[in-house]
Amino acid sequence: MIEELEKRIIQNIQKIPPVPLSLFLSGGIDSSLVLALVRKTYPQTPISTYTLAKSKDYPDMIYAREVAKLFKTDHHEIVIADGDFRYFQNKYDKIKKYNFKGDINIYILCFYAKKFSNIVLTGDGGDECFGGYWLHEYPLGHKETGRIRSIEEIHPAPRKHIEEMVRMGFRNFLFKEKSDTEDYNAVWEYFIQCLAPKHLEPLLHTAELLDIQIFTPLFSESFLSFIRTLPYMERIGRKIEKQLALKYLPESVVQRESIGFDVALEPAGDSIGYL
């Protein structure tokens, strides 16, 4: 399965022309794995990587720096001051179509990445494909305390997603005593069909405005078709993704806890830097 997974990702990468490339690098498993396989596919292609954060010692900056050095990219660390953040926010407010958290971060990265190449790669889709969200693994309906009385008893943080799932007909799954395999497959499809487009739409919209081509090697119809053939327990918790990533990446990168790109500038840093 590991070999087939790698083959499928590389097939997506091979659709990208071997010209100078830009890549959004958070130092997490998704973007780092994409970088590793892009470098394997195109060993001589110039690659410029971009990391956005609120300070130079932000975890994403530290891990991305390590990965960029490993794969010999032209790496850029972008730290945004409050005043510069407002500048970008004002520009983005005039053109934005969506209002999702972290959209401005995408706009800033695209702004800088285009300076090197109008072809940009991202690790988007990894959480959805490889079961990176808590709900993929959380033992819903297997509560030792018995019947669940409220949404907060399931999990307090993602209430908005739980409420949306209830509206979509997942109430029985969330509150019943035992969950079936079909239920978990339905949750996986929920993230693919509903959340993934919400994550990608702001990126694609910004890319269109800035005349950038976006490639997501971890998210395509053919790739999803392959992932659906895997046993559910292999799909969730990033199990198969981590096994592949360990072939190319340090364990510290593969096993690190995800912070979330949408909070990379909360709060903004003290100065703007572009190296």
Question: What do these predicted ranges mean?
Answer:
Residues 1-188, 194-252, 263-269:
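ATP-dependent adenylate-handling active sites, centered on carboxylate activation for C-N bond formation
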Residues 256-262:
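Substrate-binding beta-hairpin/strand module that engages nucleic acids
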Residues 269-275:
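Active-site- or binding-pocket-proximal scaffold segments within functional domains
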